[in-house]
Amino acid sequence: MGKRRKPRREEAGSALSKKQKKHLKEFGEQHPFYDAVSKKQETTQVVQLPESSEDESRSESEAESDPEPVNMYHKLLATLNTVSDEEEEESDDEEEEALEEAEEEDEAEEVGEESEAEDEDNEDESDGEGHGQMDELPVEAEKAGDNEEEERAGDPAAEEAGEFTDAKHESKFSLETNFMDEDNEDSKDESVPCPTVATEDPFVQHVGRELEEQDISKIGTNPKKASLKWPALGQLGVSSSLPQLQPLKVEKETDLQKLYLHKPLFSTWPKVNSPFLSVDKEQNFTPLQRELFSIMNSYRDLFFPARSPTAQGEEIRHVYCLHALNHVLKANAQVLNNNSQKRDQKPGLDEEDLRDQGLTRPKVLIVVPFRESALRIVQILISLMEVGGRKVDVSNKKRFKEEFGSEPEDRPPNLKRPEDYEAVFAGNIDDHFRIGVAILQKSMRLYSPFYSSDIIIASPVGLRTIIGSEGEKKRDFDFLSSIEVLILDQADLYLMQNWEHVLHLMAHLNLQPTDSHGVDFSRVRMWNLSNWAKYYRQTLLFSSLQEPQINSIFNKHCFNYCGQVAVRNMPVTGSISHVVVQLPHVFQRLEADSLLTVIDARFEFFTSKILPQYRDAIMSHTLIYIPSYFDYVRLRNYFKKEELNFTHICEYTNRSGVSRARQFFLKGERQFLLVTERFHFYKRYTLKGIRNLIFYELPTYPHFYSEVCNMMKAWHRGEEATWTCTVLYSKYDAQRLAAVVGAERAAQMLQSKKNVHLFVTGENG
C-alpha cells in the first residue's frame, strides 16, 4: 500500500506551481486566503491518519488539552523555524472532523451538504478555485525564467533563495561609475545643490543639516505639540523636539517647479495624476494630495489612519510615489554631479562637500501587503519617468509583469463580495515578495540586487525571510542601514497577516552594517557614519484605522528630527448606525488593572458571567466572534473541556470543514459557533442561522461589526424578537469602541459608573 501512495503525493505536488511549492516548503501550509483542497480529501485524511507520528499526535493532543499562556503563543509566532500553532490547529481540525464523519454518515452527509448548499456556497467554491490559480505562472513565464538564468550571477544569496536578480546591467546603473550627462540639454538643470549651498529645497535642507549631540539628546524628549485643522485632512497633531524648523503649512503653489520637483516630474505628474483631477479646474493635486504632499515635502513623519481602500487608496499611492521618486532622483543627481566634479578635479574643491551618500545605496523602502500593490507602484514610477510619450528603458519588465500581474480569468465572474473586499483582494494577492528597483537618469532596472537598488518594494514576510532571526547563518539586513524614506502602506492589513514581521522589520532599520559592501567612506555623510540615520529617516504610515499596535510604530519607532504629523479625526456616528436589523446591543464593560491583565480578565469574565447565560438549550444558534486567534484557541480548548455542543471555524479550516460547520450551525445541531476575525477578513461568508451574537472583543475593523450583525437578516423566520447581541469591552478598547458607537458615546460609556449599556437598532425597520 505504501508504494502506491507515493505516486499520489508526487502527482498532488506536481499540480502546485513553483510559488506554491516554495510557500509550502517555507511555511508548511498554503496561504489562508486560498482553498486548494482535493476533491477526495476525506478519503485521503482517513488513510493518512495511521501514518501520523507519535510526536506529532502528542503535540496535537497537548495543544488541545489546556489553554496555553498567551505570551507563549507570541513567542511561537515570532519563530519561523518551529511548527506554528496554526498548523497544529489545522491538522487537529481535520483529524477531529475525519473521525467524526467516519463514525457517522460519512458519504450521506456529504451528499446532503451538496444538495442543501446555498448559492453563496457555489460562489465560495469558485472563489477558492479562481484564487488558487492566481500564483501559477503561464508556461511562457517559466520559459522566460529559464532564459534569464545566465543573468543571475553576482548575487549568491538570491541564487540560493531561488530568486531572480538582474546583475547584467550592474555597470549601467552604478552610481560610482556614472556621471551627469552634460551633453544632454535635459540634464543641465538636473544637478542638485551641494548641502552647503544655501537653498530652500526641502531635500537639501533635510539631508544637509548637521545635528549636534545636544540635538540628538533632545529628540523624543518633551516635544512641543500643536493642533492644526486643515480642510481635507481635518484635525492634525503636530509635534517637534527641535526648534528652528519651518512652520507646517499647506503648500498653495501651483507651479510644480517651485515645489522643487526634480526633472522630469514637474512635466509628467499632471498627466499621471489626471484621473483624479477635475476637468474644469487647473490643478495638479486633489485637495487631499496637496495637503499630504505638503507634509511629505517637509520631510516630517506622517501618520494617516483614514486610508480607505476604495475611495482614496490610489490617490494616496500616487502622491507617495511622487515623493519617493523625487527623493531618489535628487539624491542620485547629487551623487552624479559630485562624481563629475571629482573627475574634473576643479580647484578649491573640498572633499567634505562631496559627502552625499549613505553606507548602502537603498534609500526608499516601500512596504505593501500584496504583489498587486507592488505592481501598481512600479507602473506609477514608470509613468512618472516617461517624458513626452517617450518610453523609459525598463529592464526585466516582461518578467515583472508575469510574476506580479494576474489574468482577468483568475477572478470568478460570479463572486459577490463587499466593495472594500474587492479593492483589497484585487489582482495578485501573493504576500511573499521583495524586489529591488534601480533608477538612473532616464532608465529603470527591476530586480536589481538590493545593494545596487535605490528603492526596495517588499511585503513584511518577504523582508522577514531575508532578515532572518538571531542565530541564523544566512541572514542579511545591512541593506536597511541607510533607508531615508520608509513608506508603510495599508498597515492595517499587516494585522491580518503577521504583525510580528512588521515589528521585526522596524527593529532592524538603520542599524550599522556588518560589512562595508564596497562603500567609499569619503563620500558617506557624517550623520550616517555617526549612526544617526534613524533621526533623518522619514516614515509615512498609511492605515484605514487607528489601532494601538499601529500607533506604537509611529510613537516608538519614529525619531525624525523634523517632527511628526498625525491625523487625529474622531468618528462621529460609528458603524453601529449601519446595522439594519432590529436588534438590542448589550455592551458589557469588564474591569482590568492593566493592559497585560486584560486578556485573562476577559476570559474570566466571559466564562463566569456571559457563557452561563447561553448554556440553556433555548439559547441555541449562538455565534461567538473572536478577533484574536490566541483567544480562539483558548476558548476552543475550554469548550472541549466543558464538553459543550459547539463547532468552530478559523482561517486555517479547510473548505469541507467550513461547509460542515455552517450546516451544523444552521440546522441547530451545534449550539455554538466560534469564528475568528481573520476567517471573516479572508472569506467574508454570510453565516446563516444566527439568533444570538457575542463579540468576545470589539472587531479590529469597525465595519465588521455591522456586517456580522446584518447576517441575522439572512435567516429570519419570524424570531426577530428573540435575537440578542452582547459585546465585551474594557477601557483599553477606547479606539475600537469609538469606531463602533461614536466618539461621544464611547467617552460616556467609559466614564459611566454603570458597566452595562443598551443600544437598539432597526426600530423603524
Curated annotation (Swiss-Prot):
Principal place of residence: nucleus
Gene3D superfamilies: P-loop containing nucleotide triphosphate hydrolases
UniProt cross-references to Pfam families, sorted A to Z: Utp25_C, UTP25_NTPase-like
Location within or outside the cell: Nucleus, Nucleolus
Region of interest (Promotes p53/TP53 degradation), ranges: 1-198, 581-643
Alphabetized GO MF terms: U3 snoRNA binding
Keyword vocabulary terms for this entry: Developmental protein, Nucleus, Phosphoprotein
Region of interest: Disordered: 1-170
Purpose: Component of the ribosomal small subunit processome for the biogenesis of ribosomes, functions in pre-ribosomal RNA (pre-rRNA) processing. Essential for embryonic development in part through the regulation of p53 pathway. Controls the expansion growth of digestive organs and liver. Also involved in the sympathetic neuronal development. Mediates, with CAPN3, the proteasome-independent degradation of p53/TP53.
Complex and partners: Interacts with CAPN3; the interaction is required for CAPN3 translocation to the nucleolus.
Name assigned to this protein: U3 small nucleolar RNA-associated protein 25 homolog
